[in-house]
């Protein structure tokens, strides 16, 4: 048998082994791992390319390790059966052997350890009131997350909360921010997952990670699994996609079905900027699909106000409304960038000032200095380097600072981007 034939046979056998392993058909899995390893060793013997040899060696080590664990497990299981038989005959013998599941438990512990970092221990401290607009989305999440925990008696006799919610919309509209609010308000175990947490270079490990994730969520319910950029894990099927990608998708489908069968307690919360690329079967598992649109004028005004926060400013509510009118088509992220640029203007005024004047600060009850025009009657010539830093009073933000920032910062989305989301909402979604 030629080297390419040996390698293809080895890959075919190891895929069968992994399928049996995932299905917990351990005797068959062990047998196929052994056969696959024989063919891998033959391929290694005839392979001339050093790089290819190294790849094959790493695979041999991985599958050999798994086969050894299965061997220990199967031997211990046989010992337990024999032990039970001896007990039934009145001959009890002590044993120092590990428990039957110890070999497999060590593998599960390793996977769980990799997922532990995804559990949010410290809450993000984002409240519903910190999010401007998106009232429909907030109400849907409260209905799904908070009410079943606070009023469990209402969710019986066929009344069940949603087990899958998809948040979709253009980038920067607040999908991840909503998830942070859920994590803060829910008081549930919160798993924050990205593709890097679940994708492994080792064959078969990615789907085992997915399975362990859902098992951990069920054990620690009420729990929420938040998957950001879920399209990177569960995109539409195509001829060109990898076997690994197909396996991850299949495992997600199986586990999300399992969530539904396992009654309430586990919510899968997905977020994506490109919902039309999701696999249709995955899309169906998200029973509630909520569009997170660009903010309206009222929400934009509130965003300006929230982003300015406690920074000293002269802006009025009317100024915030005026800025909202000027930023039609801006996302929440765009507005955040506008504010970040605007609040640097007082710093720039200090940095470029050639004249300062003395002012009395009521808060500290002392005289400070602040930048001013050279024509100011109280002005004295100086740069910020010649002034005691502790004596400089920060100039207040003005609406002109924001006008300047809006001119510099352009929206990141165009009409074509919005149209795609609008069409998807007509076909599959609901307004947020």
From Swiss-Prot:
Signal peptide interval: none
GO terms for MF: ATP binding; ATP hydrolysis activity
Knockout or disruption consequences: Slow growth rates of spores and severe nuclear envelope (NE) morphology defects. Asymmetric and even failed karyokinesis. Overgrowth of nuclear membranes, so-called karmellae, in cells with daughter spindle pole bodies (SPBs) that often fail to separate normally or display extensive delays in separation. Large fenestrations through both the inner and outer nuclear membranes and abnormal nuclear integrity, i.e. leaking nuclei. Extensive whorls of disorganized tubulo-vesicular membranes that are topologically continuous with the adjacent karmellae.
Residues involved in ATP binding: 169-176
Biased composition (Polar residues): 83-100
UniProt EC number: 3.6.4.6
Membrane topology qualifier: Peripheral membrane protein
Top EC class, one word: hydrolase
InterPro entries: AAA+_ATPase, AAA_lid_3, ATPase_AAA_core, ATPase_AAA_CS, MIT_dom, MIT_dom_sf, MT-severing_AAA_ATPase, P-loop_NTPase
Region (Disordered): 83-103
Superkingdom as given in the UniProt entry: Eukaryota
Keywords, sorted A to Z: ATP-binding, Endosome, Hydrolase, Membrane, Nucleotide-binding, Protein transport, Transport
GO biological process: endosomal transport; late endosome to vacuole transport; mitotic nuclear membrane reassembly; protein transport to vacuole involved in ubiquitin-dependent protein catabolic process via the multivesicular body sorting pathway; vacuole organization
An example Gene Ontology CC term for this record: nucleus
Localisation: Endosome membrane
Record domain MIT: where: 3-80
Catalytic activity entry: ATP + H2O = ADP + phosphate + H(+)
Entry's family note: Belongs to the AAA ATPase family.
Primary role: Involved in the transport of biosynthetic membrane proteins from the prevacuolar/endosomal compartment to the vacuole. Involved in multivesicular body (MVB) protein sorting. Catalyzes the ATP-dependent dissociation of class E VPS proteins from endosomal membranes, such as the disassembly of the ESCRT-III complex. Plays a role in regulating nuclear envelope (NE) morphology and nuclear integrity, particularly during spindle pole body (SPB) extrusion or insertion through the NE, and perhaps during karyokinesis.
Protein name in UniProt: Suppressor protein of bem1/bed5 double mutants
Gene name tied to this protein: vps4
């Amino acid at each position: 048998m030629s080297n390419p034939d040996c390698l293809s046979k080895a890959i075919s056998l190891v895929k069968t082994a992994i399928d049996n392993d995932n299905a917990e058909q351990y005797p068959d899995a062990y047998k196929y791992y052994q056969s696959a390893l024989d063919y891998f060793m033959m391929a290694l013997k005839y392979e001339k390319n050093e790089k290819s040899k190294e790849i094959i060696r790493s695979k041999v080590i991985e599958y050999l390790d798994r086969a050894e664990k299965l061997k220990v497990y199967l031997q211990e299981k046989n010992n337990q059966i024999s032990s039970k038989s001896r007990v039934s005959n009145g001959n009890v013998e002590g044993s120092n052997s590990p428990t039957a599941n110890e070999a497999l438990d060590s593998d599960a512990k390793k996977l769980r350890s990799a997922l532990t970092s995804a559990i949010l221990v410290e809450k993000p401290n984002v409240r519903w009131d910190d999010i401007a607009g998106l009232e429909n989305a907030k109400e849907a999440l409260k209905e799904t997350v908070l009410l079943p925990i606070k009023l469990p008696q209402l969710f019986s006799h066929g009344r069940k909360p949603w087990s899958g919610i998809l948040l979709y919309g253009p980038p920067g509209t607040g999908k991840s921010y909503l998830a942070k609010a859920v994590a803060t308000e829910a008081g549930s175990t919160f798993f924050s997952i990205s593709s890097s947490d679940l994708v492994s270079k080792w064959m078969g490990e990615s789907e085992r990670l997915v399975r362990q994730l859902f098992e951990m969520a069920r054990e620690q319910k009420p729990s929420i699994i938040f998957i950001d950029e879920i399209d990177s894990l569960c995109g539409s099927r195509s001829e060109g996609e990898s076997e690994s990608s197909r396996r991850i998708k299949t495992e997600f489908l199986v586990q999300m079905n399992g969530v539904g069968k396992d009654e309430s307690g586990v919510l899968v919360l997905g977020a994506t900027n490109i919902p039309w690329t999701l696999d249709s079967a995955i899309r169906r598992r998200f029973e509630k699909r909520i569009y997170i649109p660009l903010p309206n004028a009222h929400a934009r005004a509130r965003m300006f106000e929230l982003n300015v926060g406690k920074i000293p400013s002269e802006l009025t509510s009317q100024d915030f409304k005026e800025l909202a009118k000027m930023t039609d088509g801006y996302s929440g992220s765009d507005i955040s960038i506008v504010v970040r640029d605007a609040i640097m203007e007082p710093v720039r005024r200090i940095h470029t000032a050639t004249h300062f004047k003395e002012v009395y600060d009521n808060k500290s009850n002392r005289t400070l200095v602040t930048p001013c025009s050279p024509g100011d009657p109280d002005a004295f010539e100086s740069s910020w380097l010649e002034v005691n830093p502790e004596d400089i009073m920060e100039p207040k933000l003005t609406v002109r600072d924001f006008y300047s920032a809006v001119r510099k910062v352009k929206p990141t989305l165009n009409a074509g981007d919005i149209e795609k989301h609008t069409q998807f909402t007509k076909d599959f979604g609901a307004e947020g």
